[in-house]
Each structure stands twice: as structure tokens, then as C-alpha cells.
Amino acid sequence: MAGHLASDFAFSPPPGGGGDGPGGPEPGWVDPRTWMSFQGPPGGSGIGPGVVPGAEVWGLPPCPPPYDLCGGMAYCAPQVGVGPVPPGGLETPQPEGEAGAGVESNSEGASPDPCAAPAGAPKLDKEKLEPNPEESQDIKALQKDLEQFAKLLKQKRITLGYTQADVGLTLGVLFGKVFSQTTICRFEALQLSFKNMCKLRPLLQKWVEEADNNENLQEICKAETLVQARKRKRTSIENRVRGNLESMFLQCPKPTLQQISHIAQQLGLEKDVVRVWFCNRRQKGKRSSSDYSQREDFEAAGSPFTGGPVSSPLAPGPHFGTPGYGGPHFTTLYSSVPFPEGEVFPSVSVTALGSPMHAN
């Protein structure tokens, strides 16, 4: 870089120089790197108007320093109304209008603004934000249709004598999926979401058709209701019967099938009820015995704290040990800080006899 600049200085006059000497360059030519690096301040000595006008003449900011040169070329951002510096030198200045137009066209064609949004983008956003009137009309029509069908379903159900739970069970018989009474109630009250209403509508429509055409649907629904009730049946035993079962369990915790049938006949219960009760009672006894054994093991292990025995806090005053242990002793309190002299408990006289006695 230094060699190039030295060679340029040898053939280029310094700023403010004449350049008319022998062997000097022509008055209309100057090296761009030398011109960039030797621009004078405004009002000072610089390149004369006969050679090339400087940046101060045009009112432009100074170009970057020489170390920003890339490949021997000085880079300046294209300015509107100013012609670019040709790489070989400046031969003739271009008019401002033509130069400005050329720069604008080159800048627009070479480096378009990447941040500029396309012209059609706002239109697309507006189209997305604005709802389609046809779709809104279709949704409103579907909502009205669902409202009318919900009213029809409720009227048909009440007329045929079905409950909401019966409708759910019948759907399970017809389509293999049982719906709860809450779901049917929310459908009739239009409390389900629009999506769930649309999913449930075809199934209920088929139920309405089957209810009109199939006379045995009521019987099928009753049979399914009995099956579901048997599955969910919860047995309740009276206290008197439970007491008799408890006494029999103490005598024989695991009765045979004959004994179970005999007990069921005596108490007026079903065999399965008696059998299940004895099974549950044995499991309960196992759990209680395991809990008791765990508690005994914990007590036998003792305190988890290491060290000597931990004394329990007792009432203040002297406490005596067992006879023959070594005389009376005092139970250690939790606090190791001695009492003040003014608050010491009154001393109690102790008579050493065969057995410890409290003094009056």
C-alpha cells in the first residue's frame, strides 16, 4: 500500500500545487486515492477548481480515510445528484441531472431495499383480517339449524318418554359410544362448543330416526339401563347384619363355599355379597396387622437421635430414682443455663432411708 501511494505521489502534484511542471500529469487528471487523502478543510488550500471540485464544494460529507480503500478503489455511498468517481480517473464532469439519474437507477437496480414491504402485502393482511361474509353467513345458518334441532330433540325425547341418560345409553347401543346425561343436557341447552355440537348432531339425528322407526328401542334402552345399574350397584349392609358377619368372621375368617351359602341364607343376603364381604374383611385385617407390626418395630428401634438417654421435661423440683440405684437423683432439664440466685427453688431436706420419701 505504501509503495502504491509513493508511486502516486511521484506523478501527482500535492494539494494546491500547479501540476504544470515537466513530466507532471495533465491538469484535468488526479489519482482518486490522492484526491481522497489530501482534501483540505473548507476555505483552506485544496484542489483547485480547475482540476476537480472537492467534497466541500458540493456540500457532501468527507469520504472515508485511505485505510478503507478496497482493492485500490475508494468506496463512497452513492449520493443523489453526484456522479460516481470512475476507477480510471475523472475525464469530464457529467451534468448533475444525468449523473443523478444514473446513480438513482443504478442504486435501485443493484441494491434494492430489503426492508421494503411489497405492494401487495397490506392488501393480503387486510383480506386476512376482514372476515369473509359468505363464511359468516354459513356459520349463522348452521347455528340456527342446531338451535332448531336441539328443540326438536328435546320434544321428541319427552314425547317418547326417554330421559337424557336413556338417550346417552341408546347412543352407546347403536354406535358403541355411550354419552353421559350431562352431555345430552348441554346439547339441548346449547351449552356445548360449536365444534362439539356439529360432531354430536349426526349421531343424535340417527337416534331420532331410530326412535321413530324402531319400536323395540325403548326395550333395548331399558335392558342397557339395567346392565349399567348392575355394574354400578353399591351394596349397603345394615348394622345388625354387619355385627353378625363380624362375629362369624372371628369364628371362621375364611369360610368355605358351603359355609358362605349357609351364612347368606341365614342373613338373607346374596352369596356374592357374603363372599366379597369376607374377602374385604380379611384384607382389612392384614392391613391393620401390618400397621401394628411397623409401629412395634419403630418403638423397638428407639429414638433416632444418637447419644445418651433423653430426659423428659418434668415439673420443677427434685425427682428421685428407684431404691438401691445409687441414691436420689435429679432429672436433667432441657435448658443448661443455671437459674439466677434469686429464683432458685427452695431446698428440700431429704432423709436417706431404705426407700425414697418426699419431705413435708
Swiss-Prot record:
Modified residues (Phosphoserine): S111, S236, S289, S290, S355
Composition bias, Basic and acidic residues: 123-137
PROSITE patterns in UniProt: HOMEOBOX_1, HOMEOBOX_2, POU_1, POU_2, POU_3
UniProt binding sites for DNA: R157, Q164
Post-translational changes noted in the entry: Sumoylation enhances the protein stability, DNA binding and transactivation activity. Sumoylation is required for enhanced YES1 expression.
Motif (9aaTAD): 4-12
CDD domains assigned: homeodomain
Subcellular location, principal: cytoplasm
GO cellular component, one term: nucleus
InterPro entries reported for this sequence: HD, Homeobox_CS, Homeodomain-like_sf, Lambda_DNA-bd_dom_sf, POU, POU_dom, POU_domain_TF
Region annotation Disordered: where it falls in the sequence: 1-48, 86-137, 287-322
Cross-link (Glycyl lysine isopeptide (Lys-Gly) (interchain with G-Cter in SUMO)): K123
Modified residues (Phosphothreonine): T235
Domain of life: Eukaryota
Molecular functions per Gene Ontology: DNA-binding transcription factor activity, RNA polymerase II-specific; RNA polymerase II cis-regulatory region sequence-specific DNA binding
Alphabetical keyword list: Cytoplasm, Developmental protein, DNA-binding, Homeobox, Isopeptide bond, Nucleus, Phosphoprotein, Transcription, Transcription regulation, Ubl conjugation
A GO BP annotation: regulation of transcription by RNA polymerase II
Compartmental location: Cytoplasm; Nucleus
Region (DNA-binding): 180-186, 193-196
UniProt tissue specificity: Expressed in immature oocytes.
Record note on domains: The POU-specific domain mediates interaction with PKM. The 9aaTAD motif is a transactivation domain present in a large number of yeast and animal transcription factors.
Complex formation: Interacts with PKM. Interacts with WWP2. Interacts with UBE2I and ZSCAN10. Interacts with PCGF1. Interacts with ESRRB; recruits ESRRB near the POU5F1-SOX2 element in the NANOG proximal promoter; the interaction is DNA independent. Interacts with MAPK8 and MAPK9; the interaction allows MAPK8 and MAPK9 to phosphorylate POU5F1 on Ser-355. Interacts (when phosphorylated on Ser-355) with FBXW8. Interacts with FBXW4. Interacts with SOX2 and SOX15; binds synergistically with either SOX2 or SOX15 to DNA. Interacts with DDX56.
Homology family: Belongs to the POU transcription factor family. Class-5 subfamily.
Described function: Transcription factor that binds to the octamer motif (5'-ATTTGCAT-3'). Forms a trimeric complex with SOX2 or SOX15 on DNA and controls the expression of a number of genes involved in embryonic development such as YES1, FGF4, UTF1 and ZFP206. Critical for early embryogenesis and for embryonic stem cell pluripotency.
Name of the protein this chain belongs to: POU domain, class 5, transcription factor 1
